[in-house]
């Protein structure tokens, strides 16, 4: 290698590293998708695959018939600033209102997305807010390419011998492979705090138990332990466990810049994180969440004025965000 070639290599190499290090710093807003008086973006679910962010979320729309509909939708980005057109994945049906995607996992030769129904029949704008009925259940959808998705399939997480009617109201699913036993998959979901069931084939499920928790659970698997991220009445909290039986609170309640964010003044919730600390473009945990406001959810900013935001951290304790 000549001196001139070496000089060019070093120069361009340093430029590349610098550009990679600045991905998060190039963002100009803490808001990824901004809600308004007729639209809410809620419940983000995140997959980082081949340097692309796949963002799944609840899209709530007040439509021309003055009814309120919920959908599961998705968008993709390579830089967290430029996002593809939002693509709706589920049908327009208030008796189902598929929503709250939990995450996407790779199983055999396909991708599996978990989500819920949140039935709200005859829901009109004038009725805001209205919460889902007791018929809410858990489902999965399958894909070969992360673009085309199958019809939803019911998850009988209480076991095949428990009828759908007797399963009880359940929302906010999240899937995770066991840290010790490959091929064993867990489903976390909101029922009696957070409940847990496991399977080896996504058809036959065994109920495991439950523990105290908020909603919108997501779980990381690191250093021989599980890191559970959940949402109490306001903010985001974290627990840790090695066995799903004994849980220890970790850190303080995460509320980020809520005091200065009118768009999240009502509530911050639904945090979900991906560990990109080993990726030179990010070197952080990257967390998505939703914020609603300025009203609280009970005051009406539940199916409107809800936005998806972003924050990041080196250690899950100290968080950085744009002002």
Question: What residue ranges belong to the model's regions?
Answer:
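Bacterial Sec-dependent N-terminal signal peptides
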Residues: 1-21
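Carbohydrate-active catalytic/glycan-binding domains of CAZyme proteins
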Residues: 19-323
